[in-house]
């Protein structure tokens, strides 16, 4: 089975937290069981019929990209990730959809993203009322952590103005300068990128 054959799980009618947890876990387990452990999925713009070097490990935990309903449904249908920063970056978080209400989550999203991208959290809580459940690829970096109820929840970014957690920007700049600049990497530039979506759901959940 390939990523293209994976049927995105539509969980938008699930309204109870317990059922959402179990359905997401089942989707994660099924995805890992049906695909190989390492999945390459980005069509290569340089080598037609092949894939570039972006991959995901299909046995890892889920992370979530929060967005408004219309964009969420289109992205799930087309297997796309939307940008939520001004220079085409996509930010995901380990914070699950049942952990906080829409307003609290919106404040967290604003702290981690700027005002730009296809999804702009500064427009209000409606911009984070739905989610796409994904697994981060090797192109994602963990750039931050929030502690909520004594639990650590990571933030992960693919592209954009993000620096890996613990990195020193000045050292990175110096290293690149000495090496003659960073090696170019093939990637898709724009507000939407082709990406495996595990599940689509609503954050309007009750206990």
UniProtKB/Swiss-Prot annotation:
**Which controlled-vocabulary keywords does the entry list?**
Crown gall tumor, Plasmid
What InterPro entries does the database record attribute to this sequence?
A: Glycosidase (IPR006064)
List the biased-composition ranges (Acidic residues).
164-178
Q: Does the keyword RNA-binding apply?
A: no
Which segments carry the region annotation Disordered? 160-183
Pfam families, alphabetically? RolB_RolC
Q: Does the keyword Cell cycle apply?
A: no
Its annotated function is as follows: Involved in tumor formation and increases auxin and cytokinin effects in host plants.
Provide the protein name.
Answer: Protein 6b
What is the originating organism of this protein? Answer: Agrobacterium tumefaciens (strain Ach5)
């Amino acid at each position: 089975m390939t990523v293209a054959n994976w049927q995105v799980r539509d969980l938008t009618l699930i309204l109870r937290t317990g059922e959402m947890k179990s359905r997401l876990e089942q989707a994660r387990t099924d995805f890992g069981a049906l695909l190989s452990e390492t999945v390459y999925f980005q069509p290569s713009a340089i080598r037609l019929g092949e894939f570039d070097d972006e991959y995901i490990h299909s046995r890892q935990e889920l992370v979530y990209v929060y967005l408004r309903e219309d964009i969420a449904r289109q992205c799930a249908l087309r297997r796309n990730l939307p940008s939520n920063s001004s220079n085409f970056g996509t930010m995901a978080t380990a914070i699950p959809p049942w952990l906080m209400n829409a307003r609290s989550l919106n404040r967290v999203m604003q702290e981690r993203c700027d005002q730009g991208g296809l999804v702009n959290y500064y427009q209000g809580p409606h911009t984070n009322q739905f989610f796409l459940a994904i697994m981060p690829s090797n192109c994602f970096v963990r750039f931050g952590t929030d502690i909520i109820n004594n639990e650590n929840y990571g933030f992960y970014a693919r592209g954009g103005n993000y620096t890996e957690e613990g990195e020193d920007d000045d050292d990175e700049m110096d290293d690149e300068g000495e090496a003659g600049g960073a090696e170019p990497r093939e990637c898709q530039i724009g507000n939407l990128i082709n990406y495996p979506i595990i599940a689509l759901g609503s954050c309007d959940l009750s206990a």
